[in-house]
Amino acid sequence: MVDSSKAPLPFRDSALSFKREYAESLDAQDPLREFRNQFIIPSKADLKRKSLAVAEGESPSSDCIYLCGNSLGLQPKNARMYIDRFLQTWATKAVLGHFTKLEDSPFPPYMDYDDVTSKLMAQVVGALPSEVAVMSTLTGNLHLLMASFYRPTKEKYKIILEGKAFPSDHYAVESQIRHHGFDPKDAMVLIEPKDLKEPVLPTERILKTIDEHASSTALILLPGIQYYSGQYLDIPTITAHAHSKGLLIGWDCAHAAGNVELKLHDWDVDFAAWCTYKYVNSGPGSMGALFVHEKHGQVNLENKEDPYRHRLTGWWGGDKSLRFLMDNNFVPRPGAAGFQLSNPSVLDMTAVLSSLDIFDKATMPALRKKSLELTAYLEHLLLNSPEGVRPSDDPFSIITPSDPEARGAQLSVLLKPGLLDSVFSHLVDNGVILDERKPDVIRVAPAPLYNTFTDVWDFVQIFFDACRKAAQEKDTTS
């Protein structure tokens, strides 16, 4: 049994915490409870139906239990209205929509959309508005940032990253190294976990790796939250240590943005990139965003030799007042905006804006507080439920750090070998949506904007039942 004394209140020491009524009481006290109503929760019938249209005579069904915000966030109810307003503007104003502020529209002219979204996004990641740009996609932004921050020499050419990085990050780093004429076998320094059963990377190991390779390293790229284990890395400590060795460091915040309370500016992070379709709830494949610390985004035209940091350039990154002069003399906008390339998709940014407006009202500190309580409650029920409720043979373990400050919303649950397919199928059949990572892991991520303590309680009961049935099936077939 796990010591639950370290779990946040209010379920620390009450036997009532294992009752559904207790979860309902927590929901009734939740100051963020109304935000769930701002999202569309698919029903169980929606998920099983093979068409968009509701079949004639179909009976209403309850909401599914959606614990997959770490993979794709749910649709804000205002997204349709926002997009309809954009389509109406495009239809009635055409090209004039770039410059016309409409009296009955909540949106800026197209020309200023990126400034509005960047200001709101900056609040989500703890940045100055000038340090954030909503643009492109995550891997595209990583390439753009590495084109600026990875400047290898014969002596300093290595990139330090985790050995189990998300594949797209690994590919991006590998291709950047090859692009500069180096061999990834030598130039990629991979920080490996002990194994997939113990995937957490101790901060000490990361710092030691930096020390060992500092003299030959050009860049460090790490995840804010590791996608598989759910570990929240110690960004300020690692960043400060990298800087003490004279190294630049960037962070992939795909699983951190909208999940934990980041302070990218205060932590002196050099650069970061993230997507917006997970916890930021902007739709499948939606736009990415990037952060460039203000110290790297300065523009000083009086310095003729080095007026601004080298980067790949495009016209949308140029000074707005000069953009339409078409004189082919690039003068970047200060800050992250100067890293933009092309006119961003206003349609896509409208979807991002529909979610950021909700974050603006909820605020990241309040969301993080609830998230800590939700995930601790999930952990508490999984590990401390009474005998007779919890499966007797302990068919799973949690590989995410037990320290609440070292994780976000996600708990990664490692099942005993051979159980995953059956457990996952049972969960889906009972209206639970989460994701799996072969061969044996399910990732459970209660999102504080729309998930409830009752969602967590219901999931745990269904999961326990799924584990028992999977074990029985395995015994029958073995």
From Swiss-Prot:
This is Kynureninase. Pathway: Amino-acid degradation; L-kynurenine degradation; L-alanine and anthranilate from L-kynurenine: step 1/1; Cofactor biosynthesis; NAD(+) biosynthesis; quinolinate from L-kynurenine: step 2/3. It is found in: Cytoplasm. Its main location: cytoplasm. GO terms for molecular function: kynureninase activity; pyridoxal phosphate binding. Homodimer. Keywords: Cytoplasm, Hydrolase, Pyridine nucleotide biosynthesis, Pyridoxal phosphate. It comes from Coccidioides immitis (strain RS). Belongs to the kynureninase family. The gene is BNA5. Coiled coil: none annotated. It comes from the Eukaryota. GO terms for biological process: 'de novo' NAD biosynthetic process from L-tryptophan; anthranilate metabolic process; L-kynurenine catabolic process; L-tryptophan catabolic process to kynurenine; quinolinate biosynthetic process. The keyword Hydrolase applies. Its EC number is 3.7.1.3. It catalyses: L-kynurenine + H2O = anthranilate + L-alanine + H(+); 3-hydroxy-L-kynurenine + H2O = 3-hydroxyanthranilate + L-alanine + H(+). Its cofactor is pyridoxal 5'-phosphate. Catalyzes the cleavage of L-kynurenine (L-Kyn) and L-3-hydroxykynurenine (L-3OHKyn) into anthranilic acid (AA) and 3-hydroxyanthranilic acid (3-OHAA), respectively. Pyridoxal 5'-phosphate binds at L138, T139, F166, P167, S168, D169, D252, H255, Y277, W315, N343.
